[in-house]
């Protein structure tokens, strides 16, 4: 008899296959009783169109898998998707180049059931495993599937696809009575994913649709072995004092008795602070036959669980990331039967509504971490297009995020493997987790079985997230939950002891229990830089505040649309024909945007038409791919910088402060031209460096709404002796104005507006520069250069309100930049051995100097690290070091000025070559220097 996985305190063990409560097993990998199937032998994968035998036959030990695809577990411990299996076995080399994916597999153009024949049928996943020792209980743990699955063990069906469905719903089956000595076999028949009818996942409009709809297994399939007592589901419920002076920790662990007789054991808990003395407590627990008991350790019963002066976990810009270790064990007769181990952090999160205001009558969402108000500054996460998880790739992207200065990553659905959260904990990056929009997660009614999957998913997700200090909130997406969904989810989260905070929507919606979300969304396509400073335009008839994207409140997803990578990156994924279309045909559908065709109004993002139209009108027409890419870099830079700076600048507004911006999206799971701050090869283009500049820890902002200067301190300590100098130049390099603030002192997270008001030109059609120089105790710590026109961008608000892109009355006239004279640039570079992010072991230091004899600006100067020769010549082909991670770039210098940039990289990336730095710019010819 199959028992529901939702809401049970115990279930019969040892009576044959059945579905057991999620509490029977840790969601983490830190249990000695749990192992990942396929870790040793891998998996065999094949379409049912070829493997036509029955599940009973395929799951029989000794079944021949000759000709099947061989697939190891990925870095998250799972066999992955069907397309991933094909790629690993040689199908479609260079799948992301141009339209290779479409050529190899076909293309879907609508989210829904798979329309590609080879993926519209079930596929088999098969692996062998060894029997546990005699007398040991064995449970099969399926941690969700993308699609639905029939499960077979040793010739017997354990579960049907009616039970095993849901990307995050955990199912546990007792298979003790099915196993034989020696080799045993598991076969899983994966039925095609349909995100419009299943509680799974999809890619919305973020990219091309994966040809297999991501059908497969993205989380580990596990075997839990133990007897007679098994400990699991261990976690900490913390109550931390408001002033952070103490933290009372309640520890809970479930102990399961797998035998037919009552059992007594000693349950021990050890909490170890970083570098500190372990705290160990224990108690005896008697568990009835074939049942599970929650053993609780409270601070009142065990006073040592109240920690005085705890080590507090902070976001990386504010402090350290100490992680405590929680270890539990169950023993009988002095012998430990099994144990668990995982980490947790001590910190507080405060979520509130600030306001109200005319635009936001219920207030706007705001967050404090450890009582410190912070402006959330982040981006949306997109996993690999085929859900291939690689811990090294996560580490590389963390390096990119921290170098960029963002503090948050948002998960809209696509919840991640355990390693991902562990890395975010260690890195100090905040995680805004939640459900996905626009699919079955937002359906308004479910069957009884679907209700069960929804609640089981929430419980499993809660178990995964609850101990991770990086996860500071969980929210629904576009739509607020129905009353039924809200109850199911909150019941599931409560069963997991996951405290949230929970937000009812990513838009300005509300739900019966959680109330007002206080968030908004959009825009998603090109808007001018000064759009981000708007605080007064919104659609009064749209209560969700969609596309009211100015810098007020909390915007859960927004950006200026398409981003153009560097030429190095473009050459890795666009064919010559693709490249020609990129710079010659703005209305062309770009395969590496998404599947939406050639529309460019409303919610259609398949072309770069709106971006290109703005570039043409603002900077002038281009005559080559390289010129187009350069102009796009400049425009992307100024737009992303403005988005993040505006939200910091307006965080001081009292009525409706800017409290957070999530760039849509931070990354992509494939090479892209749409919504990304860095490409999947680590490419750092103009969009990246614009955000990086905006998020410098001590930074000056030229506010585009009132032409004054703001200074902010986004670091964790007070900065005193700070001055801000504002210099205004014309395009000939003449200084038109030069003002310096008085000495300033800024506490952590302090934002000071109007510290300087530079005098800028007013004559018509005049292009000018503003250079901001921040010094502390006389030392330069921040440079920020703007280019602007007295012919400004003017948004047609009556036509723009409610739209995902701006309709323009007038574009800024920056075409005079085309006439800048050539500048003379020199550079020096040195390399030292130094550890860096993601395995980097070298640091290159580059000093770029403008040596022009006349006052000619060196505009938008970029340095790149390349493979070359000892004489300073670049090697041919793709010579960029993709592991390089830059501290700053795309800088602008006047004669006599220098800027020192640094980059970390992996020496192995040189492949025996000499490191060479190239420097080029808008009006500077390319030079190369050896980084000796």
Label for each model-derived stretch:
Residues 280-310, 733-764, 878-908:
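Intrinsically disordered, low-complexity Pro/Gly/Ser/Thr-rich segments with frequent PxxP/GP/PP motifs
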Residues 16, 27-30, 47-49, 77-78, ...:
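Accessory beta-strand-rich segments of carbohydrate-active enzymes
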Residues 408-598, 635, 639, 650, ...:
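Substrate-binding/catalytic cleft of secreted carbohydrate-active enzymes
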Residues 307-340, 758-811, 904-932:
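Terminal connector regions
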Residues 35-51, 145, 213-216, 542-720, ...:
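Substrate-binding clefts and catalytic carboxylate motifs of secreted carbohydrate-active enzymes
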Residues 14-107, 187-198, 217, 223, ...:
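Accessory carbohydrate-binding/adhesion or oligomerization-edge regions at the termini
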